[in-house]
């Protein structure tokens, strides 16, 4: 079967469903595909298709995630749904499913529960920019006042985590009734998707951001100079442009004298390309894996940061024993391991803990032995002797 060409005629946005267990995330996801399928904008999927999510490995961590895609009038969406709560935590921290926005599903019958709060907090910490609320199971609540109270409670909760509670749309839906073909509730799903279209901003394309390429390999070509290879993470780079080499040692400036891909010469490389960049006046020993090549002045190296971390359980290949403040692992950042220290930590809700157990989620302060190009929202892994024992996201740069 020939692979269909991916039509790029609409802007692409990544979203997901988040919220408390059994509040109807997967049923709602199925309902969205079914309602849009009637307009030819999706392939209808049932609960079982989505719930039997295959396992994936991301940064050495096994995660169950279901991916569905669909379109609205103006956009193409990739939508992720996770079966278990632990999968959400791992997914959002590793960035396996990068979300440009999320649909927070909350049952009108229960109101916000423990994981509702935890997912809002997680969305804030990992930098999900916008939310839309689907107030689910509204067919089971007859009293309009109860629905109003739940809505108020959700808005207050969103405010308390610094989301704009008053402005976020809350749409009353019933995933189940819409799946069963009830036209009243089908129109509510359409209303929800209109809210998603309007409230979740279109992400800035990687190509439009300032140039950055993490160095994976370096070699010298006799008579031509030094070549650094890697995948361009964002932006573009033209032949003749000045770039900075950042990280590990002092920042220095060089000029790109050639861009090569698949042994062909290019005028410019752009986000997503695997390229070799020929650099003027740079010796092979001046540049190493783990450094980044960037647009001048766009990034500075740092040694201290705060991060949100998920520590792997023993069964996931993590540690068997706890660790304490002062623990010295390697931080795998972009393309290299950098030795560092976890100088302090609290549990994810900010309460003090003496030690970190496998399976915990923590806020930590990390300090690296040499400066590297780290940025807020960037993902990293924590490793010990080459195996991943934790995954994290930088929540704040300290120094």
Swiss-Prot record:
The catalysed reaction is: GTP + H2O = GDP + phosphate + H(+)
Location of region: G4: 136-139
User: Which InterPro entries does this one have?
Assistant: EF-Tu_GTP-bd, EF-Tu_GTPase, EFTu-like_2, EFTU_2, G_TR_CS, P-loop_NTPase, Small_GTP-bd, T_Tr_GTP-bd_dom
Segments carrying the region annotation (G1) are 19-26
Which residues lie within the region annotated G3?
81-84
Tell me its EC number(s), please: 3.6.5.3
GO molecular function ontology, one term from the record: translation elongation factor activity
UniProt-listed SUPFAM superfamilies: EF-Tu/eEF-1alpha/eIF2-gamma C-terminal domain, P-loop containing nucleoside triphosphate hydrolases, Translation proteins
Q: Name where it mostly resides.
A: cytoplasm
Family (UniProt): Belongs to the TRAFAC class translation factor GTPase superfamily. Classic translation factor GTPase family. EF-Tu/EF-1A subfamily.
* Annotated function: GTP hydrolase that promotes the GTP-dependent binding of aminoacyl-tRNA to the A-site of ribosomes during protein biosynthesis.
Indicate what this protein is called per its UniProt record.
Elongation factor Tu
